[in-house]
Each structure stands twice: as structure tokens, then as C-alpha cells.
Amino acid sequence: MNLVSEKEFLDLPLVSVAEIVRCRGPKVSVFPFDGTRRWFHLECNPQYDDYQQAALRQSIRILKMLFEHGIETVISPIFSDDLLDRGDRYIVQALEGMALLANDEEILSFYKEHEVHVLFYGDYKKRLPSTAQGAAVVKSFDDLTISTSSNTEHRLCFGVFGNDAAESVAQFSISWNETHGKPPTRREIIEGYYGEYVDKADMFIGFGRFSTFDFPLLSSGKTSLYFTVAPSYYMTETTLRRILYDHIYLRHFRPKPDYSAMSADQLNVLRNRYRAQPDRVFGVGCVHDGIWFAEG
């Protein structure tokens, strides 16, 4: 692989970056939209602006950016069990936001324009139908998956209660064994959970605290983890390209170093780098006004 500098990569035309990404990865990226209400209160006027519409526009902007940079499949967790602790009012607002994903004209046009097949995963079919509003959302999800099934350029998997797949996988495996007389393969389990087979995640782009979540069965030791300092809606093309550059050129496609073949000078540089910062830890943070920030 010809190694270009980060500056050269940042300056490449979009079509060139997309070609590199399609050829060399990443194919599957996890991008949860996190810190969205914080962004809204900082960048919008809560008295006049509508949170749902503002969030939807930003989500479309970022999804468009990811797809236009050559990423084929985006996994986007949008609602987890822990959000239930925020109360009934938040849940109602969340349901309204979820409904927009399947009904809003702007995002439907986005799916069509970018040839996006939309799928939903998680325990939403068990958890949402307890109310009429929730049942309507589930139906709209199913209808959207069917109506976009002919789109083959990109895939977008929204996670709703997708934090733990253990029970779903167990029930699916029992049913599969009863029907086919044998346990399902890994591929069949993933198809059953996500609606289609999805490769293991190449990278996860989170915000704030260093933790991954809500993409069951797809994590591996080769999943590159990235965490932005600012909430997800602050994502820029420069930020994304820096992440792509690191993933493609710096992490996985270089030969493993042979320490026995290193010169004394090379070993000294490495030793001095480690000795200069033995107490530095990525993931350690501080709290200001009740908000956690990364340090290090």
C-alpha cells in the first residue's frame, strides 16, 4: 500500500477518498448519535427550535457524510434500556423521533437518493408495542425495511433496545433447531438478529466516555475505537477523514514490527517515549459542572 501523508489524505477530492475506503475499508462502521441534547442546548434556541427536526437534519448530514466517504454499512444505536430512566416524557419524545426515521419526507428522500436499505435490530418488537404509539412505530419500521429493500448501495441499521442480544439469540437458536434439526451457524444468527448478514464492525465512533455499546455480535479485536471530545453532531469532514486515515493507513495495514531487528537508536526512542509517560491513561477524565471530559 502506498502510504500518503495525513495532509495529503485530507486534501484529496471526496471521490478519491471514497474509492480508497471502498477498496481498503472500513466497510462496517458503528456510529451512535450521542450528546445530541447537549448539542441542541448549546447550538440551537430551545424556545424556538424543534429538537426532533434539528436532530434529524444533523443525523442526515452525518449519515450522508459517512456514505459519501465510501462506508457501505452504518450501525446506529438510537435507543437503549438505560434511556428509560429518563422518564415517561423522554420516552414519548423518543418515540416521536423514532417515527420520523420512517416517515419524514427529508430522510425518506435521503434513503432514496443514496440507495440506503434501512433495517432495525434489537428487542423493539417486544418492548414498544405496549402502547398504541409504540405499536405504530414498530409497523412503520417494518414498512420502511420492506420499502427500502431494493436499495443496494448502502445499509443503515438502527438499533432500538439493542444492548443485549443474549435472550434473542437463545430463543432464535431454539426455534431454528426445532425447525432445521441443527443449531444455527454464526451467519444465520446474525441474519436473524439484524435482518441481513452484517460483517464484524471495522470501527466504532463514539463520544465522550470510552465505552462501546449496542452492536451485539459484531465486535472484535480488530474493531478500531474512536471517541470524539465533542458530541456527535459536531462531527466534521476533517474529523471523519482523520479517523479514516488512522484506520486505513496506521492501524491494521502495516507489518508487525520486529523488535529484534530494531537498532539501538530505534529502541531508545521507543523506550524514552514509554518512560516519559508511564502514568498517562486514555479513558481517565475529569468532571466540570457534572459533565465528564476526557484527559490525557
Swiss-Prot record:
Do you know which InterPro entries this protein is assigned to? UPP_synth-like_sf (IPR036424)
Report activity regulation: Inhibited by the bisphosphonate inhibitor BPH-629.
Q: Give the record's note on temperature dependence.
A: Optimum temperature is 45 degrees Celsius. No activity is detected above 50 degrees Celsius.
Asked if Transferase is a keyword of the record, the answer is yes
Catalytic activity line of the entry: tuberculosinyl diphosphate + adenosine + H(+) = 1-tuberculosinyladenosine + diphosphate; tuberculosinyl diphosphate + H2O = tuberculosinol + diphosphate; tuberculosinyl diphosphate + H2O = (13R)-edaxadiene + diphosphate; tuberculosinyl diphosphate + H2O = (13S)-edaxadiene + diphosphate
Impact reported for residue 51 to F: Strong decrease in TOH and iso-TOH production. Almost loss of TOH and TOH production
Query: After gene disruption, what is the outcome?
Result: Deletion of the gene abolishes 1-TbAd biosynthesis and decreases the formation of swollen phagosomes.
**EC code(s) of this entry:** 2.5.1.153
Co-factor remark? Can also use Fe(2+), Cu(2+), Mn(2+), Zn(2+) and Ni(2+).
> Example GO biological process term?
tuberculosinol biosynthetic process
Q: How does activity depend on pH?
A: Optimum pH is 7. It is active in a pH range of 5.5-9.0.
Q: Name one GO molecular function term.
A: transferase activity, transferring alkyl or aryl (other than methyl) groups
Keywords, alphabetical: Transferase, Virulence
Q: How the protein is affected by changing residue 34 to A? A: Abolishes transferase activity. Decrease in TOH production. Almost loss of iso-TOH production
**Which cofactor is recorded for it?**
Mg(2+)
The family classification in the record reads: Belongs to the diterpene synthase family.
* Subunit text: Homodimer.
The misc remark on file is: 1-TbAd is highly prevalent among patient-derived M.tuberculosis strains, where it is among the most abundant lipids produced.
Stated role: Tuberculosinyl transferase that catalyzes the condensation of adenosine and tuberculosinyl diphosphate (TbPP) to generate 1-tuberculosinyladenosine (1-TbAd), which acts as an antiacid that directly protects M.tuberculosis from acid pH and physically remodels M.tuberculosis phagolysosomes. In addition, acts as a phosphatase that catalyzes the diphosphate-removal from TbPP to produce both tuberculosinol (TOH) and isotuberculosinol (iso-TOH). Has broad substrate specificity, and can also use the 3 labdadienyl diphosphates, copalyl diphosphate (CDP), ent-CDP and syn-CDP in vitro.
Please identify the protein, giving its name as recorded: Tuberculosinyl adenosine transferase
Classification lineage: Bacteria, Bacillati, Actinomycetota, Actinomycetes, Mycobacteriales
